[in-house]
Amino acid sequence: GIEWHPSREVYELDPARGVALLRDGGEMPYDLFLAVPVHRAPRVVLESGLTMDGWIAVDSLTFETPYAGVYAIGDVAAVGTPRAGVFAEGHATVAAEHIAARIRGTTSSAQYGGHGICYLEFGDDEVGMVDVTFFGDKRSGELIGPSTELAADKAQFGSSRAMRWFGRDWSAIPA
């Protein structure tokens, strides 16, 4: 079965024994270990002089730093949204519009709204979706599904980004 161990810190894995060593001296056996590591900015960013409390301070609507013409997006930016690709994509779109306007000698009214979605696998070809908006007058969060229709949406979401980012069709690998 799956076990949840809140407030217990894993500090090392012993793959030969299939055991996670816990900071409190305990051990947790595992067959497959899935974890999210601590989020932190890369050393080069930390040493750049741009960070405050480990992250780069930005205007949360435009991603401009306190240094005119310098923008920070994604995992290094102190924005107030989860550090996930869907949010970084939104950061990039807004920052790119502001950078392009600066190059053209104009201004941009583009603002980040803190919107993102996350697909959740439920098994049996069913997928759910969390749809959240963190900023603005209409802050919201909703769990939609699960359904087989959302499985198709998830596949389209992934393939459209692969085409846009990498210029190639991203088809599911047959099981």
Positions of predicted regions on the chain:
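Rossmann-like dinucleotide-binding cores of NAD(P)H-dependent redox enzymes
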Residues: 1-8, 106-108
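A conserved short coil-to-beta-strand element within the FAD-binding core of flavoproteins
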Residues: 6-18
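Glycine-rich beta-alpha junction loops
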Residues: 10, 32-40, 116, 124-126
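Hydrophobic residues embedded in beta-strands of well-ordered beta-sheets
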Residues: 18-20, 127
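Glycine-centered tight beta-turn/hairpin loop motif at sheet-sheet or coil-to-beta transitions
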Residues: 23-25
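FAD-site-proximal beta/loop scaffold in flavoenzymes
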Residues: 27-93, 97-101
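Active-site-proximal substrate-binding core of FAD-dependent oxidoreductases
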Residues: 100-144
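C-terminal auxiliary extensions adjacent to catalytic cores
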Residues: 129-175
